[in-house]
Amino acid sequence: MKYSRVFINSLAYELAPVVVSSSELESRLAPLYQKFRIPMGQLAALTGITERRWWPKGHQLSDGAINAAHKAIAETGIDVAELGAVVYTGVCRDQHEPATACRIAAALGVSKDTAIYDISNACLGVLSGILDIANRIELGQIKAGMVVSCESARDIVDVTIDNMLADPTMQNFAQSLATLTGGSGAVAVILTDGSLPLTNVRKHQLLGASHLSAPQHHQLCQWGLQEVGHNIYREFMRTDAVTLLKEGVELAKHTWEHFLAQRNWLVEQVDKVICHQVGASNRKQVLSALNIPPEKEFPTYQLLGNMGTVSLPVTAAMAHDQGFLRPGDQVSFLGIGSGLNCMMLGIKW
């Protein structure tokens, strides 16, 4: 995939306000830790995550996305009528039907000819949305579009902790550990063809993207509902973290080779990378496998955890705000999502 007239003009975000430490979660798991003689502090030691953020109880997902969207509109000064598409891409959503994007679009006051829909692709949702909007722009169908997402980890972590205490086995502990890394946040990305009179000067050019998949591994990480009684369902999430990391790194290596060849880049020509945020071990193994020096990557998982689809774009926004990403940098967005899918974007910052 190659693009010649697609630009990212805003990466606006909203962080959830409730800070939850790893030690706080461990205190709730004290009976399990005592049974297996696990010392306190292991969650942070194993993941590198000391805290994450959650939305308040009763928070509606689309509210977070709406707030981020308003920030993006304020930053760019874009006329909402120019948005040819609004796509919501979170793993979490308000309901099955209608599309969560509909409430967000209504709050923004978009025009009647705006395409409004949801896209779902595990933690790669926002990247999938970016490419979907980019294709529309490159084809000349629209001049601008917005990708929005909001993720919430509170409910699934609470359910998981209850399940870990009710079924205190080492296998259940291992399959549940990844869930405890979940964080919460929202993001809005505005893309244009570069022709609109915006008030900001941000204009990061999307150059191209590569995507490879390994769907035979679709069972390694699952989040959904399971029947626990007659017409009684409970949310669950389980992850084979060891195998997921192994197969994810292998897929990332092939995608990286494809990406560099398509862009005609050497690995040394990639100035900075922004990765989906999972944890310390994942970061170390992925960067090592791709021969990327750690100083070229900007981590946020230590204080934000894994925010699903929101992690990578929020990390990019923070990296920009803190001067890590500079004008002219050749930047790669690197994402691996359950399924397995791997997606990499090339951007001239």
Swiss-Prot record:
EC number of the protein: 2.3.3.20
One GO term (biological process): secondary metabolite biosynthetic process
Membrane-spanning ranges: none
Keywords carried by this UniProt record: Acyltransferase, Transferase
Keyword Transferase: yes
Free-text disruption phenotype from the record: Deletion of the entire oleABCD gene cluster leads to the complete absence of nonpolar extractable products. The oleABCD deletion strain shows a significantly longer lag phase than the wild-type strain when shifted to a lower temperature.
Catalytic activity as recorded in UniProt: a 1,2-saturated acyl-CoA + an acyl-CoA + H2O = an (R)-2-alkyl-3-oxoalkanoate + 2 CoA + H(+)
UniProt-annotated site: Important for activity, residues: 276
First-level EC class: transferase
Active site feature: 97, 123
Pfam families per record: ACP_syn_III_C (PF08541)
Molecular function via GO: acyltransferase activity
Superkingdom: Bacteria
Sequence similarity: Belongs to the thiolase-like superfamily. OleA family.
NCBIfam families attached to this UniProt entry: PRK09258.1
Function: Involved in olefin biosynthesis. Catalyzes a non-decarboxylative head-to-head Claisen condensation of two acyl-CoA molecules, generating an (R)-2-alkyl-3-oxoalkanoate. The S.oneidensis oleABCD genes produce 3,6,9,12,15,19,22,25,28-hentriacontanonaene, which may aid the cells in adapting to a sudden drop in temperature.
Record-given protein name: Acyl-CoA:acyl-CoA alkyltransferase
Source organism of the structure: Shewanella oneidensis (strain ATCC 700550 / JCM 31522 / CIP 106686 / LMG 19005 / NCIMB 14063 / MR-1)
Organism phylogeny: Bacteria, Pseudomonadati, Pseudomonadota, Gammaproteobacteria, Alteromonadales
